[in-house]
Amino acid sequence: MAIVLPDSILSNPGLSYIRRMVLRRAYVIASVDLPRQTFARSDTHTMTSVLVLQKFTEGERRMVAETGRPPEYEIFMAIADRVGWDLRGNPVYVRTPEGEEVLRKTTRNVTTRNAKGEVIEISKEVEEAIVDDQLPAVTQLFENWLAQKSPRWLHV
């Protein structure tokens, strides 16, 4: 399961009971910090993180209750600085050191009319700016980490 939490819940000393509750009930598989502009298009500028969790089995919960602490394990952690738009929700594109937008060629299907006036669909090669979004790369890194680690405790 994945949850989006305000960073204040993850770092506020007065809310440590929430963090303890999570650690007594689930493995934190991943923690990904998101930039302030992540939810800017929803008029929210709260710093947030995504936590990927896996609930403990009943046996694991009993073990945590008996020992008073969760087991030790590795956690995937990442920080995404860019999500494809700025604080106002405007698109942000990858740029060269000189400030020019980086373009890539791609094929698009375009609906048009032929000489007879019939509606047809054609493939057209176009150049488009690349959205500056790190989340696909973070996702790929997480998938690679999972494949490499294949944690023994991960219940798929």
Predicted regions and their residues:
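A conserved structural/catalytic subdomain of Rossmann-like adenosyl-cofactor enzymes
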Residues: 2-156
